[in-house]
């Protein structure tokens, strides 16, 4: 990883115990220019709102074609940019909210560390309460998958279901993961003909999206991110997840093997586990992934449940 930082000029991680921060005002301005171009890829109309909680000001991207339905909340590290191929499909019956995780390169502003499990759950619970008076279906990729599980463990009251796409937190990160990270980082610097080959091999279509790559490098070089390497969830913690759960991982995942996915998934009382071709949780087969996610969420709608108390609404930008 040190070699990649030297080659790319990556800013590195925030000092231990400190929230994320920008390298400079110029770095933030460069990032925000790329950020605007990427979110133009989201289906329209899409609103940007800033939500105040005790721990952070959180930027949320709201797609509300059907505002009366049950909310779907998209979770990942970095920001919500890469969710654009999934938003319209997920938003056919209710609002979709993409979260820019505080402590990473995005407009959200952390006022405290976001990575301690209890702190993360408290922040997200408060955020969910300000988004809707209905339980939310959480969809999390990688670190966002850990966030969804952590929420279901520590603050499940506002959670209707969780969908986990190649989630972190189920197994210890090993050499396979770090090798994949190194190859992926270097592949994004390759000329486009070679990058296409890497994208096929790594099952990473985002690598071929120029707007996403520009945004990624602007963030990597311009922001000291809060380290996000969650501890592996214990067997008892997984057994305590009682909400409906869909776990999707790739047969060649760098995070967990199919055997690990099935074994750890079996500990969650109401989990379905799907192993799909490729390295990720189905991102290389967008239509199939969207169909699988929407079918699961529809099957576990909580429309007949009593509404939760709603907190004050967000302010629009």
PLM regions and their residue ranges:
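Short beta-strand/loop motif that positions the catalytic acidic residue
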Residues: 241, 247-249
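Catalytic histidine-centered segment of alpha/beta-hydrolase-like enzymes
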Residues: 278-290
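Alpha/beta-hydrolase fold catalytic core
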Residues: 1-71, 94, 134, 287, ...
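Flexible "cap/lid" loop of the alpha/beta hydrolase fold
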Residues: 149, 153, 161-188
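Active-site loop/oxyanion-hole signature of alpha/beta-hydrolase fold enzymes
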Residues: 97-139
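Conserved alpha/beta-hydrolase catalytic His-Asp/Glu region
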Residues: 173-179, 187-242
């Amino acid at each position: 990883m040190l070699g990649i930082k030297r080659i790319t000029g990556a800013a590195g991680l925030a000092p231990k115990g400190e929230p994320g921060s920008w390298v400079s005002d110029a770095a933030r301005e460069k990032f925000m220019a790329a950020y605007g171009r990427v979110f133009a890829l989201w289906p329209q109309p899409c609103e940007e709102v800033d939500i105040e909680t005790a721990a952070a000001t959180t930027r949320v991207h709201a797609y509300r074609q059907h505002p009366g339905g049950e909310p779907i909340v998209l979770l990942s590290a970095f920001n919500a940019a890469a969710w654009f191929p999934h938003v319209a499909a997920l938003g056919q019956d209710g609002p979709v909210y993409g979260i820019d995780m505080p402590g990473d390169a995005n407009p959200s502003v952390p006022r405290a560390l976001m990575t301690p499990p209890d702190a993360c759950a408290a922040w997200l619970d408060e955020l969910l309460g300000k988004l809707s008076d209905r339980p939310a279906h959480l969809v999390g990729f990688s670190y966002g998958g850990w966030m969804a599980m952590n929420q279901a463990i520590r603050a499940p009251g506002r959670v209707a279901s969780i969908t986990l796409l190649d989630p972190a937190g189920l197994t210890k990160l090993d050499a396979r993961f770090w090798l994949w990270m190194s190859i992926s980082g270097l592949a994004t610097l390759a000329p486009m003909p070679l990058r296409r080959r890497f994208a096929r091999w790594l099952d990473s279509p985002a690598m071929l999206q120029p707007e996403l790559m520009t945004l990624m490098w602007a963030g990597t070089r311009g922001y000291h991110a809060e380290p996000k390497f969650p501890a592996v969830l214990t067997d008892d913690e997984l057994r305590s997840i009682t909400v409906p759960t869909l776990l999707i991982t790739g047969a060649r995942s760098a995070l967990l093997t199919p055997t690990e996915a099935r074994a750890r998934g079996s500990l969650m009382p109401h989990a379905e586990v799907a192993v799909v071709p490729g390295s990720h949780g189905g991102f290389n087969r967008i239509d199939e992934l969207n169909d699988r996610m929407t079918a699961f969420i529809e099957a576990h709608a909580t429309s007949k449940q009593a509404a939760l108390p709603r907190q004050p609404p967000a302010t629009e930008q």
